[in-house]
Amino acid sequence: MDIGKKHVIPKSQYRRKRREFFHNEDREENLNQHQDKQNIDNTTSKKADKQIHKDSIDKHERFKNSLSSHLEQRNRDVNENKAEESKSNQDSKSAYNRDHYLTDDVSKKQNSLDSVDQDTEKSKYYEQNSEATLSTKSTDKVESTDMRKLSSDKNKVGHEEQHVLSKPSEHDKETRIDFESSRTDSDSSMQTEKIKKDSSDGNKSSNLKSEVISDKSNTVPKLSESDDEVNNQKPLTLPEEQKLKRQQSQNEQTKTYTYGDSEQNDKSNYENDLSHHMPSISDDKDNVMRENHIVDDNPDNDINTPSLSKTDDDRKLDEKIHVEDKHKQNADSSETVGYQSQSSASHRITEKRNNAINDHDKLNGQKPNAKTSANNNQKKATSKLNKGRATNNNYSDILKKFWMMYWPKLVILMGIIILIVILNAIFNNVNKNDRMNDNNDADAQKYTTTMKNANNTVKSVVTVENETSKDSSLPKDKASQDEVGSGVVYKKSGDTLYIVTNAHVVGDKENQKITFSNNKSVVGKVLGKDKWSDLAVVKATSSDSSVKEIAIGDSNNLVLGEPILVVGNPLGVDFKGTVTEGIISGLNRNVPIDFDKDNKYDMLMKAFQIDASVNPGNSGGAVVNREGKLIGVVAAKISMPNVENMSFAIPVNEVQKIVKDLETKGKIDYPDVGVKMKNIASLNSFERQAVKLPGKVKNGVVVDQVDNNGLADQSGLKKGDVITELDGKLLEDDLRFRQIIFSHKDDLKSITAKIYRDGKEKEINIKLK
């Protein structure tokens, strides 16, 4: 933006400075109106509600003239400061440290002055030194405007002013500006009021008013000299300006880490300076008012009047004033709070000063200071590190804040979760243990029951031996098979024992050797035997209390697959009390038995099948169920190659019927119809034609002989009759015919037979008694 007098600044800076200028003007106008109103109320002023700038030139033109004047003044200051910039780094550092601590002292002094009754003290002070103040009004014009701007926006403007004012060559001027930036709006009000009182002198009033206008014209240029130093550059585009702002912002973030290592050494230098200036403080006390600001509302003065440069004497005087303020601050208060904040502000001032110097060097074709560049690089690296630390700190702060807000709920939630996990684990363990215990209990119960049944059954099972082995007249094979077997004590009456066993075990001998589980032996007598049922009853006497009577079960309730135990004496006494386990493999089996060992079956035995291991010597042994009750007596097994675990037992209900008759009668009376028969399956073709047997008949028996006056003869059976059904049941062979007839031994009722005679079918009734 061209503002005349060969000055060009970026448009964005121009707009920003214009807004600040107009804002300050409006603020000053409102402030003056307010002060005038108060003066009217106090009868100290004859002016009321005077509107400032109404008759002045256009605001925009006034702003341009003010800005142009400031730029010219700034260029002169920059040229003067070039010579001083060649000083050594050590001098610059010492100047910075002195400025830093002086600035800190001024700020602390200002804080202490706020607690004093400023209205009375400052009014008196201003009256005594009004002449000194008026003599230095040209120097204080710009400073008065800066004070008012800094009071409205203290942090922003203060940092920008200190950016340039903290240069080593201008430390005195920086001290004055920093002192003024620390003053509050209340100080400005009191000073303005005092000046209003002094304005009663007619010969001085017009001059004071003209100086206020000069202050207003220099307000904006003085606010941010660091920005004005760049105005001689070429106009920056908006992206370049934003990039520059970001770099400056990053440099400000690392301000507190740049000069941290040198603060301890600077403190000693500051103390030396303080002791050096202490003697001269009292001599220059009357010159304090030269630093005050003068406010007036006269718009008729020249707006374009530039600020006057400060002399060396003024700079020395400013330094002495600040040393005095530091001394008073230390005397009034021992508080040290704010040191770090002032140090940080000083760091920012020095940082902006270095940036301004580098920018100025670039504009004039000079290389930046090597130390400043190194510091900038160090700042950038430190900035990155600080950003990472700041991010981690932010996360930590968020977590801490979250924990502080919600820690009771989190603790309760964690407790509930832990409680649920513990209860779940407990319940799972309990359930698991219960299941294991149930399984163990079931297994233990099963095991215990099985063992209990086995132990009880062993006490009721005995070994039966006959004297057949001593009889040399019998075949050796027969003697070896019949010489040993097992028996079951099914009844005990006092010392009398009733033992059931197989008929083929006792053989033809009346006396049997009975050996108990405790290896005691007695001689028993055979009460009776029945070869058709293969059962025998032996009576023995023993006072041994260990021999028990076995419990009797019910064979009519047998279930296929029901578990059973077989207790016997396989292979004789040496293996007595052997227990084997199995299940019921089949029910209602008709097993052909050869009693006399002539390789011809003599009888069909009704039995149930088991798969428990049965060996020679188990004949006559006990078959018990899971309750330990007797359900059968072992009778036979199939001994064939490739056949295993196919054994048969007589149902206990049939055994009870047989042993009852054997106890009382010693034998079983079966019906005898008085016939001899042949199986149809064994007839040849000539024999089939002789009896005129139809071709469809495959099974049955042929009557070969009929006894005279026998039951068959009385019933009308004749030789050559073919019987195919008996008692409503198919007749396969003569074994089946005998089994059906013997099954009616108790009732001896007549049964119906279906026969073929001379090729014709007919039925007859066969009498059984």
UniProtKB/Swiss-Prot annotation:
Species of origin: Staphylococcus aureus (strain MSSA476)
Residues in PDZ domain copies: 680-733
Sequence ranges of Basic residues compositional bias: 1-20
SUPFAM superfamilies (alphabetical): PDZ domain-like (SSF50156), Trypsin-like serine proteases (SSF50494)
Entry EC no(s): 3.4.21.-
Active site: H504 (charge relay system), D534 (charge relay system), S619 (charge relay system)
Region feature Disordered, mapped onto this chain: 1-390
Main location (coarse class): membrane
Protein name: Serine protease HtrA-like
Cellular component aspect of the GO annotation: plasma membrane
Family: Belongs to the peptidase S1C family.
